[in-house]
Amino acid sequence: MLSEKEVRRYLTDLGTWELRDGKLVKSFQLSSFVDDEFVNKVAKVAESINHHPIITINWKKVKLSLKSFDVDAITNRDIELATRIEELGTKL
């Protein structure tokens, strides 16, 4: 588990990810509602590290929320997943 101070330190390197209600949260704009390529890439990354985000899809927008529910806190797994998702997001 990471302290809030540690999480905020990591956030400085994570672009526009935010700490909201005990989760790391970020929304990504897509080119269209049917642009599922980004979500599929996120799913593959999540599966590869066995850590899965909450994914909310709205019209041309994908919101990702990360939290380690087994310990009810943000952990290094969330930071790793956010970092890898951020790399995908820069290619949108």
Language model: regions and residue ranges:
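Charge-rich alpha-helical segments
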Residues: 1-92
